[in-house]
Structure formats: C-alpha cells, structure tokens
Amino acid sequence: MVAHAATCLDGKSLAQSIERQLADHVRTFQAQWGRSPGLAVLRVGNDPASAVYVRAKEQACSRVGIQSFGAHLPATITEAALLAKITELNQDERVDGILLQLPLPPHLDPRPLLYAIHPDKDVDGLHPENLGRLVRDEPGLRSCTPAGVMQLLAAYGIDVVGRSAVVVGRSILVGKPLALMLLSANATVTIAHSRSRELASITRSAEILVTAMGQPRRITADMIRPGAVVIDVGINRIQRPDGKSSLWGDVDYEAARAVASYITPVPGGVGPMTVAMLLHNTVWSYCRRHNWQQPLLSLTSMPPAP
C-alpha cells in the first residue's frame, strides 16, 4: 500500500471526449459540404500488431463519421506499385488523409513512400514539409503521438512553461517532434537516448518526463524526480507464462505512481490519444480543403481518474 498515488492521466476518457467533438463537427460539415472526411490507411503484409492497430483506427473512424478508403496490400508488393497506390490516393478527392502503417516488409524503404504522400494528406505528420512547419512553429499536420501527449497535458491543466522536460527517445515518430512541441510551448527541453550517459541523473532532473524507449519497465521509481509528471509512450508486448500477453510501458508503473504527481497508464494513456489525434488530423485536413480554419477541439478540464 503506497502512502501517495499519482493522479492517473486518463487518455482513454479524453480520447472519447475528442471523438464526440469531432463527430459533432463531421455531422455539421457533411450537411454543409455534401461529403464526409476520408482516411486511407495502407497496410502491407500480415504483421499481426499492424492488423490490430489498423482495425482500431478504422473502428474509430466509423464512430466519428470518417469514411475509410484503406487497402491491405501483399507483403510482396514492389516499391513502384506502392508508390502508384499512394499517387492514386493523393489524387482521390474523397481522401483527406493517407497513413502508411509501419513497419513495412524489409525490402521496402519507408522514406520515399512517406515522402510521396501529399503534405496536405500526411495525417501522420512525417512528411519533411510538415516536420519543417513544426520546426518553424507554423500551422501544419502534427505527428499523432506527440500531439496526443500535448493535448493530454493541456486537458489536465499541466503547465509546461519554463519547466524542465526530458524526452527519452529520439525517433522521428515521437522523440524529435515531441521535443519540438514542448520547446514551442516554452518548456526547457532535454533529449536523452540510447547513447546518453548517466540516464538516471538526466531523468531525475525532469519536472516532466516522457519515455519513448521501447524497453519494458526500464524507468524505475528511483529514476523519477518526486512530484514529476510522467508520460509513458512505450508499448511493449510481453509474453506471460500462460501463453497470453500483457502490455507494459517503459515505466515501472506501480512503483512510479508512488513518486510522480501525474502518470499515464499503459494501456489507456497515450495509445488512445494517438488514435484520437489521427482522427483530428484527418478532419483538420478535410476542413482546410474547405477553407475552414477554426480550432476543432475545445478541451475541458479532465477530472482525476478513479
């Protein structure tokens, strides 16, 4: 029994709130503009985890009123054929967002494929033009997971201005764009990674600690500053002795919640927010094509999760 327990940052409930807001917008816009937003998720091959993720995204689209135009393509597809499919979707007026589900089979280099997606349909925020807009603090499509983290912090009234934020991980999917978003929000940002020396001393300096390492329970309670906000982006599938699997984060959750002030669970923290921001990006892209520039989300303060 711990004497103190951190407030749980409930990404699942917040994601549901975002979905409701987006669904209201979509109903209004469909009546005005005569069509619904469209998202195309491209899955290549038969990776089981990818199948689960794509199914979750398509189900979320259905709840909000976004049409799905995705495709499941064979693992043997050539780069030329996949580029042709992306070009087709770029030109399809029904499609407002395109997402290439990663990872790809080994013979496919994701970079030219991601770069082939039109920047205005790049709902994953990975095109160089959108990353450049992020660097320049200009409007553009933002990477879904980092954007979800920022929405989660805002919804719980966690002010990042002037606070020390450490991001553990430097991937183009999470670490780098999140560091830029925190910097844009006037946090004092440090990035740690696999080559960083004395990782524990770096993480203990953080008032806001974000982990995106892909190493189950790597961050232990003694690596966390008392009272820190801990955001666990890691999703690690661990096989149990009974043959079933569990999802673990990068943080030792039960121990860390006795030290932190706020913490995200795994699952139910950042994961649902990633999907919610994918929906947001799709609707945002759809709105831009109709010259509608108003914010889509109005986040109310989230109560502490039970």
Curated annotation (Swiss-Prot):
Q: In which pathway does it act?
A: One-carbon metabolism; tetrahydrofolate interconversion
What top-level branch of life does the organism fall under? Bacteria
What catalytic reaction does the record list?
(6R)-5,10-methylene-5,6,7,8-tetrahydrofolate + NADP(+) = (6R)-5,10-methenyltetrahydrofolate + NADPH; (6R)-5,10-methenyltetrahydrofolate + H2O = (6R)-10-formyltetrahydrofolate + H(+)
CC annotations in GO = cytosol
- Claim: Lyase is one of the keywords in the record: no
Q: Where does NADP(+) bind?
A: G169, R170, S171, S194, I235
Assembly notes: Homodimer.
Name of the protein in question? Bifunctional protein FolD
Organism source for this protein?
Thermosynechococcus vestitus (strain NIES-2133 / IAM M-273 / BP-1)
The lineage is: Bacteria, Bacillati, Cyanobacteriota, Cyanophyceae, Acaryochloridales
